[in-house]
Amino acid sequence: MAGELISFGIQNLWNLLSQECELFQGVEDQVTELKRDLNMLSSFLKDANAKKHTSAVVKNCVEEIKEIIYDGEDTIETFVLEQNLGKTSGIKKSIRRLACIIPDRRRYALGIGGLSNRISKVIRDMQSFGVQQAIVDGGYKQPQGDKQREMRQKFSKDDDSDFVGLEANVKKLVGYLVDEANVQVVSITGMGGLGKTTLAKQVFNHEDVKHQFDGLSWVCVSQDFTRMNVWQKILRDLKPKEEEKKIMEMTQDTLQGELIRLLETSKSLIVLDDIWEKEDWELIKPIFPPTKGWKVLLTSRNESVAMRRNTSYINFKPECLTTEDSWTLFQRIALPMKDAAEFKIDEEKEELGKLMIKHCGGLPLAIRVLGGMLAEKYTSHDWRRLSENIGSHLVGGRTNFNDDNNNTCNNVLSLSFEELPSYLKHCFLYLAHFPEDYEIKVENLSYYWAAEGIFQPRHYDGETIRDVGDVYIEELVRRNMVISERDVKTSRFETCHLHDMMREVCLLKAKEENFLQITSSRPSTANLQSTVTSRRFVYQYPTTLHVEKDINNPKLRALVVVTLGSWNLAGSSFTRLELLRVLDLIEVKIKGGKLASCIGKLIHLRYLSLEYAEVTHIPYSLGNLKLLIYLNLASFGRSTFVPNVLMGMQELRYLALPSDMGRKTKLELSNLVKLETLENFSTENSSLEDLCGMVRLSTLNIKLIEETSLETLAASIGGLKYLEKLEIYDHGSEMRTKEAGIVFDFVHLKRLWLKLYMPRLSTEQHFPSHLTTLYLESCRLEEDPMPILEKLLQLKELELGFESFSGKKMVCSSGGFPQLQRLSLLKLEEWEDWKVEESSMPLLRTLDIQVCRKLKQLPDEHLPSHLTSISLFFCCLEKDPLPTLGRLVYLKELQLGFRTFSGRIMVCSGGGFPQLQKLSIYRLEEWEEWIVEQGSMPFLHTLYIDDCPKLKKLPDGLQFIYSLKNLKISERWKERLSEGGEEYYKVQHIPSVEFYHRVLHIFRSVGGDITGRLLMR
């Protein structure tokens, strides 16, 4: 494996040496000799890599080669950079440079010559230990095996493919939680990769479990957990979102008290995923009171975590898959076409496949990974070769798995790493930077990879860095080495993470290759670390980092901080780290707020992030960083001075500016023609004309001020044909123009945010036809926008937010909005009348109407029939909405709250709400009577009623809803509904009836993410 990684490094160094000849004037002979030596060196690598496992000396040679390659890249790149910097210097600097040119070139000539000498020595050493040379004609060639492995995989990932043979386990676990009242804690234990988390997720999402419990919480505990973090997460899950800030400010004692009170009075299921030690469980469990309304489901590799000698504790140990189930799972992944009518598996492949899965020992993860490797192997010869490799990797032919020895699984999973193309090996190893269970942002990861030169030039071909990153992540996902799912809105992989066992492999390989050093302020740090000579340094969860004291490696290429909050940077001198390519200081606090000017000496830097940093002053020396492709200065809540030095960073692909730079800051950005993402661009600090040449932009966020007209904006961004996401926020005058004044003629635009005064939409041509997401706010549209918007055939999500529409009537026409799935109508204060024609919005699933106080009634007919979730708040409906909503045969969740209905009587008719499962009614202050006819709501399992002061009795029809499992209602009903009470007969069949002393805070907008964003603006 090291040989392929080195081959990748040689390729990069070869590319550096193959630049324009004029760059190497004065050192031409040394460069030519170095290229010849590299060509010679590459011919020894294959055999050296094969022999390094049996020869410590050869292994040392391979390690020395890696160091030579790194040093070579540093030397050549520094020489080229200094040449280019000299060309762009002023006259005085050029004169000084000419005076130093001879000694400088002599120094580099000696340095390059030294590299050749080191290569010659390592070749002699390898030859003396029997390493054979393979003849390579011409220039450096990538190994043929790489080219074969780089073919795109042809199998598709089945989302349920790992759920094989586990149905009986799910049924048994659900039974423990739902049917056995004496059981309090159920632990699922077994080795990593057994499918414990998959099993727990199936149970967590099971309908019977959802019916049984009022509150559900899922917590990933991990090795580095703190008790406060776990308790806070549980309370956030069980409490409404609006209390999150209050929860985060609680002391530990207050937090414990709140949780105890909550768990004493409600039925809650808490899932604690991946607890490592018995002591961890002992730290967490003080929040659980003796009252037995709560239950815990936990997963662990350690059986002793929650072992007790009483019947309230159950330890469940899933067995490995049977041979038959293993074969079924393997076929789903390795042979995705097996269900096609014409498909017939080759007999030899079947024999080899069944032989290979024996090495997996029934472990689902190992089977998935093995299947992922074989899915791209089309011939029996390929399968036979891999079968032989698996046998050679297994020690002593072990096939049994246990918690004491995971070598077999590691070998199988490691083989999936060996099968990766060399560039994907680098991509995979980079994931070792991140802590356990960490959700990695794919966009950031893509720029890390690009900054380190991992991307192959042939993969660019006009693509953005994010596009290339998506291709790489997709390959890793398809090989089941990385876990990720495409985001519904963007169709991209937005985040990813590693399975525990695959992370172990990643850390192991990173250690073998001395790929990075990990330091953590957490009590339990990464269990596999490299030495301090690593070229990459990762600090996880620091409180303080002292650069001069904590980092003592002048050859460092990457310094990355992973954190969940702010931290202090002490001794902010980077003078000894001049070879850095990646510097990520997210959420850093710098004393005095001024970034040190020595940052300008990091001329190799490609990636610099000061996102959310407490920095008030960026130095002028930042302009020296000509190679930057990623610069993130985004900050909120404070003004940050940024000097006008960005125009020279012509390699920039990603630029995020501070949200507030003050009126005095003026930035020239017209040279940044390679930008793909530009965040927080403000016309207060830059000219709109600078945008004209940024034709590669795919994401643009603009803040307008008073002096800017929409016509000027339209002229400036009209040529940005590759825009996919556009946000425009108007912080200036409300009277820019009486017309829209801008045509969004972007054929690739999918997501559009507009917060600006735009009282009219003349035609649908204002919006591109491929738009999938549209948010409008503060537009003050005078005419109904629906006739225009409903013609957007690809629109899936629409929000008309605060003051977006000032008219009274909206009509959704027949056939309109053919793809719309979510509709949010928020704070439309003048809106009174809504008409929906038949066949409008046929795919609508979620409807959210909030603070539309003049809306008196819903459309009597033709509400989209496929609606599954509806939330109505502050709407003041005069007519009973239930007869209309009851006809929605797919509706599963309904929330009516906060004076939404101002009438007296509501009726649920017989046969109405045939699929409704959850009904929440609260704060209807005029509501007096509720009639539920027999046959209504046959599948209702959860009912909330609270703060409806004029409602005097519950409907008799409740006694016929036998599916009802949970009733939550305010304390004033306790006497009437308790045993012996006059209405007890209506609720005696309900397993759980709970009474509350205070108002239930159960508000949860179905469009919660949209509402949250609205409130943050």
UniProtKB/Swiss-Prot annotation:
**Residue intervals passing through the bilayer:** none
InterPro entries per record:
Apaf_helical (IPR042197), LRR_dom_sf (IPR032675), LRR_R13L4/SHOC2-like (IPR055414), NB-ARC (IPR002182), P-loop_NTPase (IPR027417), RX-like_CC (IPR038005), Rx_N (IPR041118), WH-like_DNA-bd_sf (IPR036388)
Organism domain of life: Eukaryota
Domain NB-ARC positions: 147-460
Name the keywords, alphabetized: ATP-binding, Coiled coil, Leucine-rich repeat, Nucleotide-binding, Plant defense, Repeat
LRR repeat residues: 602-627, 649-674, 675-699, 768-791, 792-819, 841-865, 937-962
Coiled coil (UniProt feature): 25-52
Which positions in this protein are listed as binding ATP?
G190, M191, G192, G193, L194, G195, K196, T197
Q: Which GO terms describe its biological process?
A: defense response to other organism
State one molecular function term (GO). ADP binding
Q: Which family does it belong to?
A: Belongs to the disease resistance NB-LRR family.
Cited PANTHER family = DISEASE RESISTANCE PROTEIN RGA3 (PTHR36766:SF40), PLANT BROAD-SPECTRUM MILDEW RESISTANCE PROTEIN RPW8 (PTHR36766)
User: What is the stated purpose of this protein?
Assistant: Potential disease resistance protein.
Identification of the protein by name: Probable disease resistance protein RF45
The top of its lineage is:
Eukaryota, Viridiplantae, Streptophyta, Embryophyta, Tracheophyta
Q: Which gene encodes it?
A: RF45
